[in-house]
C-alpha cells in the first residue's frame, strides 16, 4: 500500500503518472496552498517537489514522458490561471509563460506528445469554454464556443486533445496541430448534459453523460462518421456524483457515487479488435511500402505518429522506435514480397 503524505486536511487530491509508472500527487492543504509530491518506491515515502505560498482554489495535473505539468489558479477572486512544469530529472519547477487567463476556473490540463493544453471556463467572458495550448514559448488561446458551460473535461489522445464542456450547450472539441474540430453533442442530451467524462479505448472516443430532465447516466461512443451511439444499457437511471471513466485493454470502467452516497463500479467489455497486422504502421490493414515511408519520415523528424502508429512501429517491442525497427520492417516486407 502507498500511504498519503501526512497533512491535517486534504481539500483536493489529483494523481498523475510519469512514464505511466511513477506516481505524483497534487493536493491542497487546509489553507488551499498547493503541494506536489512524488513517490519514492525505494524509500517508501512521498518526496516534496513543490509547495505553494498562496491561495490556489483550482488545480489539475498531467504528465508525459518529459515532465509533470500543473495548472492552478491564484487569488480568492478573480482566479488568475497559471501553469508550471516539474522536471523529474533535475527536480526543478519552471513556470510556463505568464498569466494564461485573468479569471478562470473548472480547468483541466492534458499532455499530448509534447503539446500541453488547458481547457478552462473564462469567467471574464460569459463563462465560455476556452483552450490554451503551450507552443514552447507562449500560450495560444482559442475560444471554443460562444455558449457558456459548467465544468470542463480534457483528455490527451496521441497528438490530439479532447475538450468536453458540460451543460449541453456546446459541442465536443478535438484539437490537433493547431486545428479544432467541432463534434455536435448527441441530440438526446443537448441542453441537459450536467456533466460529461471522456475516455479513449481501442482508438475510439467515449463519454459518460450525467443528464437531467429526465435523470439518467449513460455512455456514448463516437462513430467514425462523427455520429454518436449509445453504448450498452444506461449505467444508472438517475443522476450520479463524481463519475470517473477509464479504459483498460478491452474494457471501460466507470466509477461513481449514487445519490445515497454508495460507490458503484461498472464494467463494459468492448468487442475484440481484429488482430493487428505486423508492420502495419499506418493502420490501413496491410504492411507495405507506405509503412516504411511513414516510419522513415518519423525517424527523420518530418512527421509525428499517433499512439496506435507508435505502438505498431515498435517492432522490437523495446518501448522505443529507432532505426532497428525500420530495418526489421524492411526485412519483413522483403519476406512478404
Regions found by a protein language model. Give the residues of each.
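Extracellular, repeat-based ectodomains that mediate carbohydrate processing or recognition
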Residues: 1-273
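Cellulosome-associated attachment modules in secreted, modular CAZymes
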Residues: 272-337
Amino acid at each position: 500500500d502507498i500511504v498519503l503524505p501526512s497533512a491535517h486536511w486534504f481539500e483536493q487530491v489529483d494523481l498523475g503518472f510519469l512514464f505511466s509508472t511513477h506516481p505524483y500527487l497534487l493536493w491542497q492543504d487546509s489553507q488551499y496552498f498547493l503541494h506536489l509530491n512524488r513517490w519514492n518506491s525505494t524509500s517508501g515515502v512521498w518526496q516534496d517537489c513543490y509547495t505553494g505560498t498562496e491561495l490556489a482554489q483550482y488545480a489539475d495535473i498531467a504528465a508525459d514522458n518529459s515532465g509533470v505539468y500543473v495548472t492552478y489558479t491564484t487569488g480568492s477572486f478573480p482566479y488568475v490561471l497559471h501553469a508550471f512544469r516539474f522536471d523529474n530529472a533535475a527536480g526543478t519547477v519552471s513556470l510556463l509563460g505568464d498569466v494564461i487567463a485573468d479569471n478562470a476556473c473548472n480547468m483541466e490540463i492534458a499532455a499530448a506528445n509534447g503539446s500541453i493544453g488547458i481547457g478552462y471556463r473564462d469567467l471574464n467572458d460569459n463563462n465560455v469554454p476556452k483552450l490554451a495550448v503551450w507552443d514552447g514559448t507562449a500560450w495560444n488561446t482559442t475560444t471554443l464556443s460562444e455558449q457558456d458551460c459548467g465544468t470542463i473535461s480534457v483528455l490527451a489522445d496521441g497528438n490530439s486533445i479532447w475538450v468536453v464542456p458540460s451543460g449541453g450547450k456546446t459541442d465536443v472539441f478535438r484539437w490537433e496541430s493547431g486545428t479544432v474540430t467541432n463534434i455536435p453533442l448527441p441530440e438526446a442530451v443537448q441542453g441537459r448534459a450536467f456533466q460529461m467524462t471522456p475516455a479513449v479505448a481501442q482508438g475510439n472516443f467515449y463519454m459518460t453523460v450525467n443528464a437531467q430532465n429526465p435523470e439518467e447516466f449513460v455512455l456514448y461512443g463516437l462513430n467514425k462518421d462523427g455520429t454518436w451511439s449509445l453504448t450498452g444499457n444506461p449505467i444508472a437511471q438517475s443522476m450520479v456524483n463524481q463519475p470517473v471513466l477509464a479504459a483498460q485493454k478491452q474494457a471501460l470502467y466507470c466509477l461513481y457515487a449514487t445519490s445515497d452516497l454508495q460507490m458503484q463500479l461498472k464494467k463494459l467489455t468492448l468487442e475484440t479488435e481484429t488482430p493487428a497486422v505486423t508492420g502495419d504502421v499506418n493502420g490501413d490493414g496491410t504492411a507495405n511500402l507506405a509503412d516504411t515511408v511513414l516510419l522513415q519520415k518519423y525517424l527523420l523528424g518530418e512527421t509525428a505518429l499517433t499512439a496506435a502508429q507508435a505502438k505498431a512501429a515498435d517492432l522490437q517491442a523495446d518501448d522505443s522506435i529507432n532505426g532497428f525497427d525500420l530495418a526489421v520492417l524492411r526485412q519483413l516486407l522483403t519476406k512478404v514480397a
